[in-house]
Amino acid sequence: MLRKIDCVMLPVPDLTSATEFYTRVFGLLPLWRDEMSVGMGMPDTDAEVVLHTMDLPVDQSVHYLVDDVPDSVAMAQQAGCYVRRAPFEVVIGMCAVLEDPYGNPVCLLDMSKGQRTS
């Protein structure tokens, strides 16, 4: 079900200074930007570091790509996962937040609307 790590979400107080810092220090390059986040690319993977100013739980920073969020949620729920947040729409498709039987968050994304480019 989990295909890959799609992104790691990092909270920052200022997108402009954080973008400059992650470019200068870590060699990441901006891929896209909106008013609350910037997707930063790494040279050897298509996974992104997403710098953001949103009020999100810090334990939900890693997002896994799946083929279909609603189907994946149903399968995981049958296997014993708890649904912290039911599937909801995001720019690229659908997202949901599960909790495994050990208390760990499992954030799922699909790209049913297509990959973000700007």
List the predicted regions and their residue ranges:
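Short aromatic/hydrophobic contact patches that present stacked aromatics
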Residues: 7-9, 39, 50, 61-63, ...
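Short glycine/proline-centered loop/turn elements that form peptide/ligand docking sites
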Residues: 17, 34-38, 91, 115-116
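Short amphipathic alpha-helices within nucleic acid-binding modules
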Residues: 21, 70-75
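Conserved short beta-strand elements that form part of the metal-binding/catalytic scaffold
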Residues: 28-60, 105-111
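Vicinal oxygen chelate
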Residues: 73, 78-118
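Short secondary-structure junctions
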Residues: 27-33, 82-87
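Short glycine-enriched loop/turn motifs at secondary-structure junctions
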Residues: 2-4, 54-59, 89-90
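N-terminal beta-strand motif that seeds the catalytic metal site of vicinal oxygen chelate
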Residues: 1-19, 46-47, 60-62, 112-118
